[in-house]
A protein has these predicted regions:
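Hydrophobic core
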Residues: 11, 15-16
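Consensus positions within tandem repeat domains that build extended binding/scaffold surfaces
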Residues: 45-47, 67-70, 90-95, 113-118, ...
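Short, structured coil segments at secondary-structure junctions
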Residues: 714-716
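Sec-dependent signal peptide cleavage junction
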Residues: 17-30
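Structural signature of tandem-repeat unit edges
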Residues: 28-42, 52-65, 75-88, 98-111, ...
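Bacterial N-terminal signal peptides that target proteins for export
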Residues: 1-10
Length: 723
């Protein structure tokens, strides 16, 4: 049963005419409709805050003000009538009255506070007072059921987020005298034809109409000089934009993701287009002529799939990163743009119809991947270019790069896969060449980088198969595989300034004959000259301490090598397969050697190991086919696995009396071995140590009663006693 309860006397949170206050508040589980006393003049802050029983309230004439949060969180309040006497509604007065369906406002209300009807989810429509001049911030935010708002003609301002999140709001005609729409004011509203923006508007805040899906046209009037970032972004119903205001800058993201925009008319006063302004406007074909345009911001026209024409850019100074990325239909020549200073990263990435990079006297920087898909056969007359970013000119159409006198920085992969590039002009001031900078530039023959004091990154020139000569005399650092697979490279004039050399730096430079003086390195890196089959001349510095793994492996043409007496370590396979070495003398400074260190040095006839080495590394001189003399270290204790394997010219050998062990297949296939002296110190000989030796021709020289004599008898080797 519907019950009406008269609130007898004054409530403690009501102000009576005359100022007296009562002592109690009516509480009743039956009470669903409250009727306030006739002598109430003001409903105070929080008067009914969170009242879970309140369904309807009757406010008498005479009340002039409803205080802040007065009815906030009255979840079951469905209806309220506000009398003509009320002139002010406080902030959050009806905040989160989620069941409120009917509100009748007095036309005498001149002030409604922030968030007054915030999150009134059930409210379908409201008529605002005729005397109201401004809608406060967040007043109807998240009123998800709100469809229609009637606003007075005298309204001047709609505050920030006033209707944000009113997803069903379709009807809210903007009055003719409106001057400001605040930030996020209609964010995510369905919205009707708000394209009818009044001529009086001077300001639209950021993201004011974001995701207003039913907007179809936008006209920016002449007085509307202040439009905020993202004001119309994600309004994918907009098809036409007419910007009449004489602005100099188009805001960031203003029409971002307005996919179906077809026509945009901008004023001739524009000198700058902000970041993401027209990002992903997929149907945009023409943006007009920009004779005064100086700057186009990052991603301003990115993913504009149908964009063909942007007119002249004669005044342009900067094209931001990703400005036109993936605009595959864009037709534009960059030749002769006299004021262009910067082409940002990815600016024209994926733009195959962009052409030209000549006669740009002001150009200082080409950003990462800026022109990787453009049609640019020639780069010429760029006197001020200082920097080319990563993949900046990674371009298969590029044939010639002219002189670049100011160039300092070549980024990673800057010219990677520029497979048609034949000439790179003089660039004497380069200090950095990034990783993979010229990778796979297989036709590159002329490289104007001789003598530059640069740092060269890893794989910078890998597989530049037409390079023939390099002057690296002032280069301080060369990264891993920097010149690997440069198959026609014959001469490296000098490496005398080098302080850092990466592994595999010249790997498989199969035509490389001469490497000039190497700088004061302490370590020669792993595989640095591996498979340099023609290498004939290399000088190691007297600072060298370590020769790395496979450093000269398969340098078949190397006739000699002088190992400085500063070297203490030679790692495994360091000289493996150096077929042309005739004599190998390892200085006594060496105390550590890796396996197979000289394995396969087929032409070496004499090999001298260092005095103080205490072991022979596995396969150390295996397959030294022409070796006839081997000089042991003085203190060696064992002959390791496969050490003399395949030394088919070795006829006679005397094992030092420091040796105690002859290991697995140590002399395997020494088919010419006829005499071996084994001292009494040897106490272990592996059963396979002499496999493949011709037993009928081999004579062991042993000490009477020694382990060697016993072994020879047991295994039927012919032996004689040492004298």
């Amino acid at each position: 049963m519907r019950t009406t309860k008269l609130m007898a006397g004054a409530l403690t949170l009501l102000v009576l005419v005359g100022g007296a206050a009562a002592a109690e508040t009516v509480q009743s589980s039956e009470s669903t409709v409250y009727t306030l006393p006739a002598n109430v003049s003001r409903i105070e802050e929080y008067a009914f805050y969170g009242d879970g029983e309140l369904r309807e309230i009757r406010i008498p004439e005479g009340v002039t003000e409803i205080g802040d949060y007065a009815f906030a969180n009255c979840w079951y309040l469905t209806e309220i009538t506000i009398p003509e006497s009320v002139t002010k509604i406080g902030a959050h007065a009806f905040d989160s009255c989620v069941s409120l369906k009917t509100v009748q406002l007095s036309d005498n209300i001149t002030e409604m506070g922030e968030s007054a009807f915030y999150r009134c989810l059930s409210l379908p429509e409201i008529t605002l007072p005729a005397s109201l001049t401004g809608i406060s911030a967040r007043m109807f935010e998240n009123c998800e059921g709100l469809v229609t708002v009637t606003v007075p003609e005298g309204l001047l301002e709609i505050g920030d987020s006033a209707f944000a999140g009113c997803k069903k709001l379709e009807n809210c005609p903007l009055p003719p005298n409106l001057t400001r729409v605040g930030s996020y004011a209609f964010d995510k509203c369905t919205l009707w034809n708000a394209e009818l923006l009044p001529d009086t508007l001077t300001e639209i805040g950021e993201y004011a109409f974001r995701q207003c899906k039913k907007l179809t046209e936008v006209t920016i009037g002449e007085k509307l000089l202040n439009v905020g970032e993202g004001a119309f972004c994600d309004c994918d119903g907009i098809k036409k934009v007419d910007w009449q205001a004489k602005v100099t800058r188009i805001p960031d993201r203003v029409f971002q993701s307005c996919y179906y925009i077809e026509t945009v008319k901008l004023p001739e006063t524009v000198t700058e287009i902000g970041e993401y302004s027209f990002y992903s406007c997929g149907y945009l074909t023409d943006i007009g002529t920009f004779e005064r345009m100086k700057r186009i911001g990052a991603c301003a026209f990115s993913n504009c799939d149908e964009l063909v024409n942007i007119g002249t850019l004669d005044a342009i100074e900067e094209i931001g990163g990703g400005a036109f990325i993936s605009d595959q239909k864009l037709v534009l020549s960059l030749d002769g743009l006299q004021h262009l200073r910067i082409i940002g990263g990815y600016a024209f990435g994926g733009c195959p119809k962009v052409t030209g990079l000549r006669d740009l006297p002001a150009l200082e920087e080409i950003g990462a991947s800026a022109l990787d898909s453009a049609n640019i056969p020639e780069v010429a007359n760029l006197p001020r270019l200082r920097r080319i970013g990563a993949s900046g000119l990674s371009n298969r159409s590029l044939v010639t790069v002219g002189d670049l006198p100011s160039l300092e920085y070549i980024g990673d992969s800057a010219f990677r896969n520029a497979t048609s590039l034949t000439t790179f002009g003089a660039a004497p001031n380069v200090t950095y060449i990034g990783a993979n900078a010229f990778e796979e530039c297989r036709k590159l023959e002329t490289l104007g980088l001789d003598g530059v004091a640069a740092e060269i990154g890893r794989e910078a020139f890998i597989a530049c198969t037409s390079l023939k000569s390099l002057d690296l005399s002032n280069v301080t650092s060369i990264g891993e595989k920097a010149f690997s697979y440069c198959g026609t490279l014959e001469t490296v004039v000098s490496l005398e300034s080098i302080t850092s050399l990466g592994k595999n730096a010249f790997e498989e430079c199969r035509s490389l004959v001469t490497v000039g003086k190497i700088g004061n390195l302490t370590r020669l890196p792993n595989e640095v000259f591996r498979e340099c089959k023609a290498l004939a001349n290399v000088t190691l510095p007297d600072t060298m301490e370590t020769i790395g793994t496979a450093a000269f492996k398969h340098c078949y043409g190397l006739p000699e090598i002088v190992i400085p007496d500063s070297v203490t370590t030679i790692e495994e396979e360091a000289f493996s397969g150096c077929d042309s070495l005739k004599e190998i003398i390892v200085p006594d400074s060496v105390v550590k050697m890796g396996n197979h260190v000289f394995g396969g040095c087929r032409s070496a006839t004499r090999i001298v190991f260092p005095k103080y080495l205490t072991y022979l590394p596995g396969s150390g001189v295996s397959f030294c086919n022409y070796m006839v003399e081997f000089v042991f270290p003085e203190n060696v204790k064992s002959i390791s696995n496969y050490f003399f394997y395949g030394c088919i010219s070795l006829k006679e050998i005397v094992i030092p009396d420091t040796v105690t062990t002859i290991d697995f297949r140590a002399f395997w296939d020494c088919t010419s071995l006829t005499r071996i002296t084994i001292p009494a110190s040897v106490t272990k000989i592996d059963s396979t140590a002499f496999d493949g030796c011709k037993k009928d021709k081999l004579v062991w020289v042993v000490t009477p009663g020694s382990y060697a004599e016993t072994y020879a008898k047991k295994n039927y080797y012919h032996y004689v006693y040492a004298k």
